[in-house]
Amino acid sequence: MKKFTSKKLTAYVMAALMAGSAMLGTSFGASTAEAAVKVNPIAGISDDFIKGADVSMIPELERLGGKFYDNGVEKDCLTILQEKGINSVRVRIWNDPYSYGPNGNGGGVTDEKKALEVATRAKALGMKVLVDFHYSDWWADPGKQYPPKAWENHNAKQLAKDVYNYTAKVMKDFNAAGVTPDMVQIGNELNNGMLWPVCKTDTPEGYKALADAIAQGLKAVKDNDPNNQVIRMVHLANGNNNALYRSFFDELIVNNGVNDFDVIGFSYYPFWHGSMEELSYNMNDMVDRYGKDVIVVETAYAFTNEQGDAQKNCAGPTEEAIAGYKSTVQGQASGLHDVMEHVSNVKNGKGKGIFYWEPDWIPVEGAGWKAGEGNEWENLAMFDFQGNALESLDVFKMVSDQSKPVVEYKVKEIEAALVTGSVGQPVEMPKKVSVVYENDVVKSMPVVWENAEPVFDAAGKYTVKGTVNGVAGKTAVASINVIKKVNLVKNGTFENGDLNGWTITGDKDAVNTVSSAGDARGKSAMHYWADKGFKFKATQSFTGLKDGKYTVSCWTQGGGGQHYYTLMVQTSKGEKSAVVADTGWNDWHQWVIRDVEIKDGKATIGIDMVANAGNWGSIDDVEFYLQE
C-alpha cells in the first residue's frame, strides 16, 4: 500500500504556529500562571500540534446577536480563540441549505458563502482552515447521509461526477478569494457511507459507489491544488470502534484502491464513543495498517449540566456518568487535555492534532440545531451562556508550557452509588464506584462492600459502606432504595458491564454490552450487531416461583428492521410475546407483557431475535415480577 509522508501536514501546522504567534502580540509559550484550571503539560507534544476548532456556527450566531467576551471585554470570537492558542479552524459546507426554504433549516445554514467568510477571517488571524464537505443540504452523520436535493435520483456514475464538480467549484472559489483550504475532508462521519441510498455501505455495490465518489472528491482537491499543499482526509465517527475502521478502510483502500489521501479523521466524544484507551488503540492500529496520519477531528466535553435554553441538551447527567469527567469547567479542561495527550502519544509522531467541535455555540435565540428548535450544545461550548470565555480555553496553551511542573492529582471524593433493591431479595451491589480526583477526572474503580449481598426485610432507605483499594481516607457509600416490587431478573440493568446471569444461544458473537450514552439508559446495556444475518436468544429461567400473575418488561432502542424481534415469556401454559419495533437511536420504548399466569413455579423470560446484516440496538432494564 502507498504510504504518505507527513510533509504537507508539517507545513500546515508550522505555518499556523508561526503566524499565530505573530498575531496580536500573543506568544505560543505565553505564561499561564493566572489560569484557574489545572492541567499538566503534555510531555513530548510537538510544537506543530494542531489545536483546532470547528466554528461553523459563528456567522449565524453573530447575525442573531451573539456576542463574545474575554475577561469582560467584547471581542471577535475568532480573535479570542486565536489568542487562546487555537491555530486552525474547521468549517462545514452544505450544498444548498436553502433548498429547505428561504431561511434554511437551522444548524447555522452553513453554505459555501458562510464557510468562505469564516475562512477569510481565520486566515487573516494566521489560522489554518479545514473544509468539511457534507455533500448534503443539511446535517450528514452516521444516522443520515441524504444527497442534496439537486442530486436526488442520480445514479452512482452521476453522483461521482457531482462530487467532483462541486468539490472543484468550491476549491476554485476559495483559491480565487486567496484562502485556499489547508486541509479538506471528503464527506463527514462516513461510517455508513454517504449520498444514500446509492453510496450506502450495506451492499458491495454501495461500497463501490462510495469509493468512486470519495475518489472523485479527492481528485477534485488534487486537481485544484497546483502546489500540492492541501491535506486530504477521510473521516469516520465512533473513534473507539476498531472493527468499524478496519472494515471501512480495508474496503476503501484494499478492495477499491482509493488511497490518495493523507489523514484518517476520528470523531471521539467520550460519552458516546467509549474509552480513550480504545481510541488510542484504534489510532495506532490505523497508523500501522495504512500508514496514515491521524487527527481527532471532532471532540467536546461539558462544562455544566445546566441548560441555557428550553431545548434538551445532547449531554446531561447520564452522559457525565459515562464520560469520565465531571461536567465542570475543570472537567472540560481535563477532558480536552487528555484527548490531546492521547493523540500526541500516537506512535511515530503520526498523531497530528485535534479539533474541538463548536466551542462557539452559545445559546442565541434562533441559532438552533434545526429551524424552530433550540441549541442542544451550549453546555459543551467553551464560552458560558452569556458568551464569556471559559478558563478551559487556556488548556490549548497550557499543554505546551513545559516550564510548569507535573502534578499528581489526589482523590477529592468517592461518589455515592445509587442502588435499587427489592424487599427480601439480595441487593445487586455495584462492582465499581466513581472516584473523583482534584482535576475532576472520574475513574471507575473496584470496591469491596462490607456486605456484598445485603437483604432488607422492609422497604426504605439504607446505606452500605465499602473501601476502594489505594484510596486512603475515603469511604465508599452505597445509598440503597429498597422497594416492595421484587424484580427477579439477575443483572437486568447490565450496570456492571457484563452479561452475567444471562444465557445467550445462537450467534453469541453478535451480543455484548455497550457503555455509551444513548446506547444505554444508565451506564451499560445489552447490545447487538453483526455485519451478516444473525439470530440469538438471551434468556433467564426461574424455578420456585409463587403462584400468581407476573409482568415481564424491557426497554429497547435501535435501528429496527429485524426479521423477528420479541420480548417473550415461556410457561407451562405456552409462550406469550410482545413484538419489539425500534424507531431509531436513543429513541427508547418499553415493551410489557402483563398477566402471565404461573402455577407450577417455572418460567423462562428473554429476548428472541432473527436479524438482518447490520441490524443494531440495545436492551436495558429488564424486569420480571409478581403483580400485587
What kind of feature is each model-predicted range?
Residues V407-V441:
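Solvent-exposed, low-complexity, repeat-rich "mucin-like" stalks and linkers
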Residues D76, E495-H527, D531-K532:
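Extracellular glycan-recognition surfaces and repeat-rich motifs
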Residues A53, T120, V131, F494, ...:
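Extra-cytoplasmic beta-strand recognition segments
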Residues D440-K474, A478-S479:
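Serine/threonine-rich, repeat-prone extracellular segments and beta-strand-based repeat modules
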Residues S572-K602, N612-G614:
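Extracellular carbohydrate recognition and processing domains
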